[in-house]
Amino acid sequence: MSDTTRRNPGPTGPDAPPWGWPPADSSDLAVWLRSFVVDGVETLLDRHAPGGRLPRVFAGHAVEPDVTADLAYTLGHLRRGGVEQIAGAPVDEIVRTLLAGIDGDRTHTFFSYRVAETVLQWGPWDDNPLLDPLDDHERSNVATACDSSEWIELLDARILPRNYAAVLARCELARMRLGLLGDPAVVDDLLQRVVDVLADNPLHHLDDSVHGVGRYDIYTADVWLFTEPLADHIGPLWLDGLRTALELVERTLADDGTAVAWGRSTGSLGAALTVELAAASLRHGVGDAPDRWVARGRRAAARLPGWFTDGVTDAHRHRSPYGYRGPFRRLQLTLDLYGKLAWAANELDRHRDTVAVQDAELNTPLDELVRFDDTAASVWCTRGPGGSNVVPFVGATRSDYLCAPRSPGTYEVPVDSELACWVPVAVVGEHRHTVTGVPVRVDHGPGWVTAEWDGLRSGAELDGEHGPPDLPGTVRGHWRTAGRGLHVDWDVDLDEAPRAMWWSVPERADRPLQVQWRTDGAPTGRADTVLVDGVDEWRSFWSRTHRVHQFELDPTRRARIELRVTPTLRLSSSAHGHHYHRSLVEPMGDAVVDLPLAWGPLADTAVDRDAIDLFHLHWPEWVAFDDLAEHRRIVEDLGARGVPTVWTAHNLTPHAPTPTGAPPEAFDAVYRLWAEHADAVIHHTHAGRDRFVARHGAGHARHVVLPHGDFSTLWAEHRVDRSTAEQRLGLSPADLRIGLVGAPRTEKLVGEFLEGVAACGRADVQVVCWSLRDDETAPTDPRIAIAEPYREVDEATYALRLSACDALAFPFDPDGGMQATGTVADAIAAGLPGLCSDWWFLGESLGEAAVPVGHAATQVAAALERLDGDQLAAARSAAIARREHTRWSDVAARTLALYEQVVLDRWA
């Protein structure tokens, strides 16, 4: 591809390599889209269709004329966008090769107009430079491919849906413009039929069904794009309809950019529709705001690379499109998508220099019921802490049209199936029944919607008639938002008891759900989870279901069940794998998905940043060192994605030596940046909180004080009694053994404490020190039994050392920069008193378990002289009493509550 054809599409990221997040400017987005299509089509041609000579078979399926038509159509859009060569050949030449070999007799409807409109780009039929080199037979074949006039009889006989009038109108209008149609009355008649169809509903929403059952879906919006070439003939109705389509998708847009997430033909096509609507919005000047529509198109475009491999769509791999778009139409779907994106790029070219708002700005709170007509047909649209979600109440009885919540990546259902999810399923005889079709009524209030049906119906059809219920009764569903979750209550009252009744909730492997069921009295129920990973029938448009949560009731006519579903919080931590982070997260269990760091030079590039709900920052210096510009880029990206940040402020500045060797003060700007950005900051003491705020500012964050947890879960099982530890360490007996453990710190005055021991007159004291700096030596004194440089040891060794001690010493400089030390929590867990300096952290954390001894050698010597057994016993009892305060289970529960609150705060 030439440099003029393909421009850098944007920064490379882990979520869509090598394309990255698309550019925000509409002009650059147009180039990005066109480049993406050119790259994909080139790859497809090079691998499977050199020179435009399509194969006759693709992965076991015959290649039909629809592929020829769609490839020519896509190339026509690229040509209009300025692409003259592709895969080393002129676009004109490839299109000519395709049309010369097309099977005209088997090309019809959608593919007829695509051939005709493509040919029209080169001018009228006579003297058309594209067709001139073809022989008479080939030209006749192309003319036949453009002609679907015989289908008009099927439309007259109502064998085809009424909206096929638009398809045939495009066919005949293009033929008339080519000069292949003599009687314009045919076009006029078809255009009038199109107007009749579009004007049928005063709300401008298309019911795409044959029987008028209220099948509102992706085509409810798409029909207005499809009829754009007819807009001049349709009149003002068309622009009103486009405005309605845009208003609908402004409400139904999913977090992944899918325009309409229920019904048929969504998934990859749902993303493409959003891009198309963004282009149409700019071209025609309708929609809420141009910059917001560019942002919507950009959001959808960012996911497009994930729908393709080697130029071919992945919509059939590990997921499924609708049945009529099965693997036998894989190439056609591929080119259908490319054609839509190429068209959108051309439209965006006309409206330059509109810059998208940040993606997070699209995430404004929403709670709205969109009515499709004067019946109860509607869709409930919500956007909040649980993401964007829709619940449709429409016609058709296949799985995709039932009133299950849809939020791609979180709430998905099987494609084109009789597997009904989130709704009651009752079996009578061999037939299953559920709530299908438009409800009798739908009521909406703040944060909730209620729907009622007159019973349950059997069958799972795309276009069946809506007859009386097979199981009469009254069935009500009540949906309401609850934080990040969704609560659904079902009241079922049937005239006849089925032999079985159940509910099913599918779950993706990468998006665990916390599911709770409850039944109100009799009958009793049974909950279960079933692994279905790899079972084809459980595939959705976007993924495959990993497991199904199911709840069955004993046979009954009447039932009331409550369903509570909350997506597991996806947490990325800058300390992933560190023992502090492990100790914090493990007690949270299934409430979180624990993900590695996803930002900065140390990031795990396999982590999808768009699949993160919250970022937990620990030590900023280990995210991007002292590179302030990189820290700023990370902060901006978090903000653009709307990912909140919780920061545990372990320090005021990094420990020395810092990761880069720079002095700790060099990181002040980095710490201030994160203090301004963070949504919550965790401190381990109130005094630490006050010092942090005084130095770095409060920002807009919640400042919360939570204790430092102890690490006893890592070493408790290795503890032994004191005498055993004494023997294993080769220590002589002592009445009072004081330990110094933990890594050296500038503020940790180990030498002063040891000098104090050497200066005191007590003979019953023994000190064991494993905390010296490498360049530090201890006084020569027989009471200092061990004086070793710090080395990280395993859990068993650490437990052995604690077991040998009667107290731990904490000789920290009260005026230093440290905010906390985890060894204090270990002292509490081990039931050991702390011999403490005047450092404020020690007194607040240890309480009565702290024995003041100062930090200078003279202070330590004097304090040791005064220390008696009663003091130590009282401090030991106080340490044991404080264990509940430092248990990670409690710290984790309080931290998890903070996580949830921070996510909710984003939507306050």
Model-inferred region functions:
Residues 255, 259-514, 519-526, 534-540:
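Extended polysaccharide-engagement surfaces of secreted carbohydrate-active enzymes
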Residues 873-900:
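A charged, aromatic-enriched C-terminal amphipathic alpha-helix characteristic of glycosyltransferases
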Residues 808-809, 828-829, 833-836:
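Short hydrophobic beta-strand element within catalytic cores of glycosyltransferases
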Residues 775-799, 807:
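Nucleotide-activated donor-binding/catalytic signature segment of Leloir-type glycosyltransferases, i.e.
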